[in-house]
Amino acid sequence: MIRFSPSMQVGLLCSACLWVVPAEASAQTADPAAAAPPAAAPVAGKRVFTAADFARFAPRTAYDMLVQVPGFTIRSADQERGLGQASENVLINGQRIANKSGGAIDQLKRIPANNVERIEIVDAASLGIAGLAGQVANVVIKSGQKASGNFEYRPHFRAHYAKPSLIAGSLSYTGKTGPLDYTLSVKNEPGRGAFGGPIWIYDGDGVLTETRNEVYHSEYEQANMQAKLGYDGPGSSIGNLTLGYTPYWNPVSQKDRRLLVTGEERSRDIQTTLDGYYADINADYEFALGPGRLKLIGVRHWEHEPLVQDLIFRFDTTGAADTGTRFSRDTRIGETILRSEYGWKVGRNDLQVTLERAFNSLDQIGELFELNPEGEFVEVEFPEGTGKVTEVRYEGMTTWSRPLSPKLDLQVAAGAEISHLDRVDDDQEVRKFFRPKGSINLAWRPSPGWDLSLKLRRRVGQISFYDFLAQPKLSEDRENAGNPDLVPPQSWEAETEFARDLGRWGKTRLKLHYYRVEDIIDVIPIGEDGQGIGNLPRADRFGFESVSTFQLEPLGWTGAKLDLTVGREWTAVDDPLTGEKRPISGIRNKWAGIQVRHDIPGTQWAWSAYADYNHYTRYFYLTEVNRNLDLPFFAGLYVENKNVFGTTVRVAVDNIIESKHKVWRTVYEGYRDRTPVAFFQKQNQLVGPIFTLSIKGTF
């Protein structure tokens, strides 16, 4: 019998209560902050939102509008090799943005809000686009858009350990000259990670043997420069070209001082540098051909990822010579995609045939060094860290979409992929895979305010080329052997979604899923006592997620809304050592979030507060089991003014409840099913509050 924790029971009860609220019409007021909350106008199976529905939020970009759609959750595109079937649940002008430069979501962040005609929420089955399921947002852009630009300055600071991020933000300009429209943009999306505090080490009997004080900080800077060109014509043809270049810098520092119960002091210093870049060219051209339209897509991606990591261990009180290791990895990644999509209509039937060829490569030179008594790094043999992996993949799909009735839509997609996977520098033959794939998608609108969908899918996953080569984990003193015998996972998947439009009360949605995964990726034994990434025979995943937006105006709180999310997933896989059932490693299995926003009537002020909870299963390696809960409980708030000299200014404080970085490790002397525990490790470290200033505007 499945038992729900009290928090899960409360979340499900709140969601269930929303399902029984009757849908009601909403009223309009003159004050944008006091205006009725976004309530879609039903149009032939669609929920339609216009600019007036978002006036109270004073959005600056199309993305700012989309995130305020009640009960809708944005899903980004899967970052897999090739383009394949659609996974991003956002369209622009009814078209999937099939590229490797951020997709539709990234483009919406560059489109001014006043260029948006409307946002439509539709059922995936009613579209002729394979891969989508549930609710999909179609953002319709005005044809006569004016030249304009957006800017945002978004510095953020942490109270402890991390360096401030002062150069953060974006600048974009969109214009049109004749048949050519263009968007030029530059942005920096930095990241910061930092924590510090005590670590306790216990022996196998639970006796404290060592205490450590650690400080970790990571600074990531990513300067993206992009030019997007669109050409209208001749006739009904449409072309797009996107050029992007992104250098990035990611230094990481991890230092600790160690005090043994014997009184001896030691220290460890790990320094990592990763200064690389990636570049993209994305082009597509669509034109009328015969009874339908043909779209040709080309993608070229390059990435250079040079990583150097130094670990030095010092014996501070004994005077013994330092020990250490250096791991360097110079990796070059490439991807070339050619794709064609031909769609046509026969009566009430929409048909589409797609063909795709993708070539991917990873070329890595790995080097390993040991620190000698003179303090110099001396190279040691490390042939397993160098190699080249390539894959040529062909995919063909046919998609048929048809309305079976005014309330029922059907979509069927069927096809297969052929993959040639090769570790170029070894003597093994090229491995060839043939994988059938496809989906059946049903969308049903039994009555006004209800949307139900069901999707059955055969999915082919992908594998990381890095796992073919050895990738040592210096910070955890754990080897990770390469595995040339990896195969892509496959899965049978069932998803169903129930959506209820509550009128002026908001929107609620419940999604259920079950996945039967074959050849799942996990850590397996390699050689006599090694470990690395490999395949296990099968695994099961099933769970639910409830997403609701509850408008509080009917309760008398004008301008306020409540967003509520609750999710749970159960997983099972056979452990490769013990054969016993256990959860899949590192899966988020419990999550919940609540956020309230209040746009104060009669003013330009708004405020919001939120709280999130995320819980993950343990990581199961062959020589250790650990659990890493980084900020499991997280809360924050912000205050916003929507007109400060024509800009929107927001001040936010996150992690106001001082959530910690928590780690529990159980490390064994060898394989965990046959050797005793070597030590236990416990961490409960400070992260501290995070402060963010955002200034957004248009010009």
Predicted feature locations:
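C-terminal beta-signal and adjacent terminal beta-strands/loops
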Residues: 28, 615, 641-699
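Extracytoplasmic beta-strand/coil segments of soluble accessory domains associated
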Residues: 38, 46, 63-100, 124, ...
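N-terminal periplasmic accessory domains that precede
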Residues: 62-65, 106-107, 131-155, 167-169
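Short acidic/polar hinge/loop motifs at secondary-structure boundaries
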Residues: 96-123, 171
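Transmembrane beta-barrel wall of Gram-negative outer-membrane proteins
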Residues: 161-196, 207-254, 273-293, 438-440
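Face-selective signature of the C-terminal outer-membrane beta-barrel domain
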Residues: 226-248, 272-429, 433-435, 443-445, ...
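Outer-membrane beta-barrel signature, preferentially recognizing the C-terminal barrel domain
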Residues: 270-278, 331, 389, 431, ...
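Gram-negative outer-membrane beta-barrel transporters
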Residues: 513-516, 535-621
